[in-house]
């Protein structure tokens, strides 16, 4: 079972998506945060196999957080989700250590498939 950290600033979306992921037999959201600060804190607590990070986040620093998460835990893949269409932004996050950048417009099935690709 993949244990997931989910960092997303829209709490209703984060809670609903977490609930849906928890219905899957091989996925479990074990930590959530709504900001870079909360994401860093939850990752420091440990116990996760993969992270989903929304960008942008309200307190900035998401790129540095992804870089720090990757450097501290290179075996923990980070899936970045965003509404930002700028390929340059996507490339910066991939260079920072994100395993994949996924547009937020994709279906939930595509999100699940991406998490499974990264988490197993």
Protein language model regions, located:
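Conserved acidic segment of CheY-like receiver
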Residues: 2-12, 17-21, 51
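Negatively charged, flexible loop motifs adjacent to catalytic sites
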Residues: 12, 35, 84-88
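Acidic, metal-coordinating helix/loop segments flanking the phosphotransfer/catalytic sites
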Residues: 32-50
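Alpha4 helix (beta4-alpha4-beta5 surface) of REC/receiver domains from two-component response regulators
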Residues: 64, 85-100
